[in-house]
């Protein structure tokens, strides 16, 4: 079992470097290796580093979006078990990363979780959308995507974002136990079963037409203006 602890700045905001590093860490694992993914403090991940996006503009975005999708699909399709120990806020891309795990445990006082992309003004890449479609209970899927709402752990478990609410002091211990239990299953059968479960989502992720349309929206001047405004409002609140 491998413990991967996110540690990238104050909020584990997803930059190009973050995505490439996490992809590389998973690529270096043996295929059947169980993984526990967690972070420190009160934030699991605040999602995409919007400051980098707004500063880097279109040239940065054209590199970042493929790296983001590769990272998320790498975690989602890892043949071994992946358990997310969500220690704190998991917002936007941070929520998607958590939902790429097979088992999701969240600390009782772990803050909020949800996908806020619609509020930022950017569409989901197909990889992110399909991960969320797999995680969220069908009756709550449209609400979660189109409202941009974030949820308490109790609200999140009812909607499928997470599977269990755990006391903070035992979160990591429980996550390791869950990963160890899954790792004890016959690895070849586990990997194939997981691939069969994910097959429809993995097929829907292959949408070059949507990728191009999404990149066009992300790189549009009006979108970048909206992102800058969202960042400014967020900083004022904090």
Residue ranges of model-derived segments:
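C-terminal long alpha-helix characteristic of the crotonase
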Residues: 106-107, 111, 162-208, 234-238
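Glycine- (often His-adjacent) and acidic-residue-rich active-site loop
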Residues: 20, 39-71
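Glycine-rich beta-to-alpha transition loops that act as phosphate-gripper elements at the mouths
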Residues: 85-91, 144-149
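Conserved CoA-thioester-binding segment of acyl-CoA-metabolizing enzymes
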Residues: 1-38, 59, 73, 77
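Well-ordered beta-strand positions
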Residues: 103, 143, 147-149, 155, ...
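CoA-thioester-processing core
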Residues: 91-144, 174, 178
């Amino acid at each position: 079992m491998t413990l991967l602890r996110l540690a990238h700045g104050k909020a584990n905001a997803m930059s190009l470097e973050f995505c490439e590093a996490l992809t590389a860490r998973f690529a270096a694992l043996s295929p059947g290796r169980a993984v526990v993914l967690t972070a420190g403090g009160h934030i699991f991940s605040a999602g995409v580093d919007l400051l980098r996006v707004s500063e880097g503009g279109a040239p940065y975005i054209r590199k970042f979006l493929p790296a983001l999708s590769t990272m998320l699909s790498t975690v989602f399709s890892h043949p071994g078990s992946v358990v997310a120990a969500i220690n704190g806020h998991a917002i936007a891309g941070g929520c998607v990363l958590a939902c790429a795990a097979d088992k999701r445990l969240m600390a009782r006082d772990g803050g909020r979780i949800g996908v806020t992309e619609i509020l930022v003004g950017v569409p989901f890449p197909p990889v992110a959308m399909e991960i969320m479609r797999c995680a969220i209970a069908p009756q709550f899927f449209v609400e979660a995507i189109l409202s941009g709402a974030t949820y308490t752990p109790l609200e999140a478990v009812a909607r499928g974002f997470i599977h269990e609410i755990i006391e903070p002091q035992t979160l990591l211990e429980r996550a390791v136990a869950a990963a160890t239990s899954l790792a004890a299953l016959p690895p070849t059968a586990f990997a194939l079963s997981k691939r069969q479960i994910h097959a429809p989502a993995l097929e829907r992720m292959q949408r070059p037409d949507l990728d191009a349309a999404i990149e066009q929206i992300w790189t549009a001047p009006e979108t970048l203006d909206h992102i800058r405004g969202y960042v400014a409002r967020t900083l004022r609140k904090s």
